[in-house]
């Protein structure tokens, strides 16, 4: 790269309150189009908004978890624009007095910790949803008025990889606070990215482009990587970067010009006359602060310092509260800490990715996973057998030992039976026997593999190693 990359992210998070930001309508995902609306959402003349106090509490909780200063006085403003899914022709947002400012989160990239500043967190209402179908469009106002918080980072991010790490950490923190389920596929987390380039050593920022239609963390990274390359090529060829909004095209992996970017003046912000300012005293702040649960960094430190897990394991296990809670419940049922960590990061994650399901959508429970891990610990079940048992355990639930027995996968621990497999392997692989005698350690591993293959993975591996060494020493 001939230039330094400067990235800032704007993340919208939908709060999972029961009702909307300024109306009593339900704020649930997945209802029939236009069924979760009332006269306030539809902007009937004369109706007045009423602030949802729980949404304010949750915005404060999120801001505190992000190490932000909470405003003593915060007000709402009108952001004026016309669009079919915005019935009032303005959005109630916050302009110059947001509820939270001056925060930060720490991210890890390539083994190094970096602090990313957060400029502000403000509250606003969501717009409806437009669906374009050929020559006509459909509008669903269920989402209109849903409470949002917008979290704006400082331009401290220097690469697409750092942007990805920031989003992962931000999502994790918000999920732990319980104020949102932060599911991109359901629209409860959305991200716009601003990116510009400047010569190394220059303090002044370059002209930025805003990227939209970033529907996954991978698309955020890919969109930024493409835009980084596009801007560099443009600057090196003597061209100029325009301040514009661009859309990421998932099929081509490129960004496409949407429009010349608007500034904040185009929205003609002014104070919302129908909502009085919020006055937040210390007692209110303290009440909210007491509701903040254990956050990912605290759990991570606990897993390393108290449970003895490697930092990498602790990082992976705490990425989502769902996985972290499952891990803690499993070891509470008596499963070995490291074995549980290995299974959650390995076999469990592989199963979830392969079947495109969430952990809580499976039949797996901390109790039945702990049961399987204890069978591995005491030698009743080998790792190979566990890999065959696990998919059924996750899909149907039940008991790992019963699944093993029902499928004829019981581990062979009878010495006489195992000796037959051992001697057969030795007779069929005389060269490996010679290699072992000549000090080649790999020969032992090869012979164990042959025995496990012959027994269809059901031989007790510890006993196999013991008997194999015993028989080799006789030859």
UniProtKB/Swiss-Prot annotation:
Pfam families (alphabetical): GatB_N, GatB_Yqey
Record GO terms (molecular function): asparaginyl-tRNA synthase (glutamine-hydrolyzing) activity; ATP binding; glutaminyl-tRNA synthase (glutamine-hydrolyzing) activity
PROSITE patterns reported for this sequence: GATB
SMART domains: GatB_Yqey
UniProt name for this protein: Aspartyl/glutamyl-tRNA(Asn/Gln) amidotransferase subunit B
Family indicated by similarity: Belongs to the GatB/GatE family. GatB subfamily.
Record key words, sorted: ATP-binding, Ligase, Nucleotide-binding, Protein biosynthesis
Top-level taxon of the source organism: Bacteria
Primary gene name: gatB
InterPro entries to which the protein is assigned, alphabetical: Asn/Gln-tRNA_amidoTrfase_suB/E, Asn/Gln-tRNA_Trfase_suB/E_cat, Asn/Gln_amidotransferase, Asn/Gln_tRNA_amidoTrase-B-like, GatB, GatB_C_1, GatB_Yqey_C_2, Gln-tRNA_amidoTrfase_suB_CS
GO process annotations (BP): glutaminyl-tRNAGln biosynthesis via transamidation; translation
Catalytic activity: L-glutamyl-tRNA(Gln) + L-glutamine + ATP + H2O = L-glutaminyl-tRNA(Gln) + L-glutamate + ADP + phosphate + H(+); L-aspartyl-tRNA(Asn) + L-glutamine + ATP + H2O = L-asparaginyl-tRNA(Asn) + L-glutamate + ADP + phosphate + 2 H(+)
Binding partners and assembly: Heterotrimer of A, B and C subunits.
Enzyme Commission code(s) on record: 6.3.5.-
Keyword hit for ATP-binding: yes
Annotated function: Allows the formation of correctly charged Asn-tRNA(Asn) or Gln-tRNA(Gln) through the transamidation of misacylated Asp-tRNA(Asn) or Glu-tRNA(Gln) in organisms which lack either or both of asparaginyl-tRNA or glutaminyl-tRNA synthetases. The reaction takes place in the presence of glutamine and ATP through an activated phospho-Asp-tRNA(Asn) or phospho-Glu-tRNA(Gln).
């Amino acid at each position: 790269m001939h230039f330094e990359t400067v990235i800032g992210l704007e993340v919208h998070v939908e709060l999972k309150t029961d009702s909307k930001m300024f109306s009593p309508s339900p704020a649930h995902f997945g209802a029939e189009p236009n069924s979760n609306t009332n006269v306030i959402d539809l902007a009937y003349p004369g109706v007045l908004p009423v602030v949802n106090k729980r949404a304010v509490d949750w915005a404060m909780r999120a801001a505190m978890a992000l190490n932000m200063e909470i405003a003593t006085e915060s007000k709402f403003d009108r952001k004026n624009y016309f669009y079919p899914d915005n019935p009032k022709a303005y959005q109630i947002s916050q302009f110059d007095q947001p509820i939270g400012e001056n925060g930060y989160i720490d991210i890890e990239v390539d083994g190094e910790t970096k602090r990313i500043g957060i400029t502000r967190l403000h509250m606003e209402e969501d717009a409806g949803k437009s669906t374009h179908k050929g020559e006509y469009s459909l509008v669903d106002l269920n989402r209109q008025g849903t409470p949002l918080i917008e979290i704006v980072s400082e331009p401290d991010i220097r690469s697409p990889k750092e942007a990805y790490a920031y989003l992962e950490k931000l999502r994790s923190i918000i999920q732990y606070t319980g104020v949102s389920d932060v599911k991109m596929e359901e629209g409860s987390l959305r991200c716009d990215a601003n990116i510009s380039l400047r010569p190394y050593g220059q303090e002044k920022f370059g002209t930025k482009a805003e990227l939209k239609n970033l529907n996954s963390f991978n698309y955020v990274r890919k969109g930024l990587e493409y835009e980084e390359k596009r801007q560099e090529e443009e600057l090196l060829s003597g061209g100029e970067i325009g301040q514009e909004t661009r859309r990421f095209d998932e099929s081509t992996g490129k960004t496409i010009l949407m429009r010349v970017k608007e500034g904040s003046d185009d929205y003609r912000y002014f104070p919302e006359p129908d909502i009085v300012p919020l006055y937040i005293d210390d007692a209110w702040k303290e009440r909210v602060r007491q509701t903040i649960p254990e956050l990912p960094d605290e759990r991570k430190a606990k897993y390393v310092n108290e449970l003895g897990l490697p930092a990498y394991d602790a990082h992976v296990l705490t990425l989502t509260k769902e996985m972290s809670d499952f891990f803690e419940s499993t070891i509470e049922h008596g499963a070995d800490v490291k074995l549980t960590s290995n299974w959650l990061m390995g076999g469990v994650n592989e199963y979830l990715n392969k079947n495109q399901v969430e952990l809580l959508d499976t039949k797996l429970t901390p109790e039945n996973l702990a049961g399987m891990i204890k069978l591995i610990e005491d030698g009743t079940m080998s790792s190979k057998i566990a890999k065959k048992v696990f998919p059924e355990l996750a899909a149907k639930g039940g008991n790992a030992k019963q699944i093993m027995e029902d499928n004829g996968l019981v581990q062979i621990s009878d010495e006489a039976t195992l000796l037959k497999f051992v001697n057969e392997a030795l007779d069929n692989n005389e060269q490996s026997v010679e290699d072992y005698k000549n000090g080649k350690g790999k020969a032992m591993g090869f012979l164990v593999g042959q025995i496990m293959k012959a027994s269809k993975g059901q031989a007790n591996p510890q006993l196999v190693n013991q008997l194999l060494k015993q028989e080799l020493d006789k030859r």
